[in-house]
């Protein structure tokens, strides 16, 4: 079983960008924790990060061919990217939306996700633990 983990815009800056909101953990550290859990679960993961909406759409399309599920942090695209929403809807595999921060306790424009209604699940506000829960959920939904 393979799960694709997609990190959206600005997540490459984790550890430096607003640590009071996102914590001090880096993207590399998140990916390492995910790899450790994947080993325990007996699943393969492929982690990708992009600041480009179009590239994320392409990666979601690729996931439909190469993976059994997706863990997806769309970053700021969460709030307005109908292209990503349509891609999640179209791929036909379990997709868990995840956010480090609680988007519902932040600025008004961040309190709405256009992705959540078409995702299999939505986890936010739990920091790195949210990613680990999302990986467990994706694996369970994909059938392990």
UniProtKB/Swiss-Prot annotation:
<feature type="binding site">
    <location>
        <position position="110"/>
    </location>
    <ligand>
        <name>substrate</name>
    </ligand>
</feature>
<comment type="similarity">
    <text>Belongs to the type-II 3-dehydroquinase family.</text>
</comment>
<keyword id="KW-0028">Amino-acid biosynthesis</keyword>
<dbReference type="GO" id="GO:0009423">
    <property type="term" value="P:chorismate biosynthetic process"/>
</dbReference>
<feature type="site" description="Transition state stabilizer">
    <location>
        <position position="17"/>
    </location>
</feature>
<feature type="binding site">
    <location>
        <position position="86"/>
    </location>
    <ligand>
        <name>substrate</name>
    </ligand>
</feature>
<dbReference type="GO" id="GO:0003855">
    <property type="term" value="F:3-dehydroquinate dehydratase activity"/>
</dbReference>
<dbReference type="GO" id="GO:0019631">
    <property type="term" value="P:quinate catabolic process"/>
</dbReference>
<comment type="function">
    <text>Catalyzes a trans-dehydration via an enolate intermediate.</text>
</comment>
<feature type="binding site">
    <location>
        <position position="79"/>
    </location>
    <ligand>
        <name>substrate</name>
    </ligand>
</feature>
<keyword id="KW-0456">Lyase</keyword>
<protein>
    <recommendedName>
        <fullName>3-dehydroquinate dehydratase</fullName>
        <ecNumber>4.2.1.10</ecNumber>
    </recommendedName>
</protein>
<dbReference type="InterPro" id="IPR036441">
    <property type="entry name" value="DHquinase_II_sf"/>
</dbReference>
<dbReference type="InterPro" id="IPR018509">
    <property type="entry name" value="DHquinase_II_CS"/>
</dbReference>
<dbReference type="GO" id="GO:0009073">
    <property type="term" value="P:aromatic amino acid family biosynthetic process"/>
</dbReference>
<feature type="binding site">
    <location>
        <position position="73"/>
    </location>
    <ligand>
        <name>substrate</name>
    </ligand>
</feature>
<comment type="subunit">
    <text>Homododecamer.</text>
</comment>
<feature type="active site" description="Proton donor">
    <location>
        <position position="99"/>
    </location>
</feature>
<feature type="binding site">
    <location>
        <begin position="100"/>
        <end position="101"/>
    </location>
    <ligand>
        <name>substrate</name>
    </ligand>
</feature>
<dbReference type="GO" id="GO:0008652">
    <property type="term" value="P:amino acid biosynthetic process"/>
</dbReference>
<feature type="active site" description="Proton acceptor">
    <location>
        <position position="22"/>
    </location>
</feature>
<dbReference type="InterPro" id="IPR001874">
    <property type="entry name" value="DHquinase_II"/>
</dbReference>
<comment type="pathway">
    <text>Metabolic intermediate biosynthesis; chorismate biosynthesis; chorismate from D-erythrose 4-phosphate and phosphoenolpyruvate: step 3/7.</text>
</comment>
<dbReference type="Pfam" id="PF01220">
    <property type="entry name" value="DHquinase_II"/>
</dbReference>
<keyword id="KW-0057">Aromatic amino acid biosynthesis</keyword>
């Amino acid at each position: 079983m393979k799960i694709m983990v997609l990190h959206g815009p600005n997540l490459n800056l984790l550890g430096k960008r607003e640590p009071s909101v996102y914590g001090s953990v880096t993207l590399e550290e998140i990916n390492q924790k995910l790899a450790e859990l994947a080993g325990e679960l007996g699943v393969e993961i492929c982690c990708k990060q992009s600041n480009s909406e179009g590239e994320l759409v392409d990666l979601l399309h690729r996931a439909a061919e190469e993976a059994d599920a997706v863990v997806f942090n769309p970053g700021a695209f969460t709030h307005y990217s109908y292209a990503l929403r349509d891609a999640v809807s179209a791929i036909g595999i379990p997709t868990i939306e995840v956010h480090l921060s609680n988007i519902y306790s932040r600025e008004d424009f961040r309190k709405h996700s256009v992705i959540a209604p078409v995702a299999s699940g939505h986890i936010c506000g739990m920091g790195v633990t949210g990613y680990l829960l999302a990986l467990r959920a994706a694996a369970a939904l994909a059938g392990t």
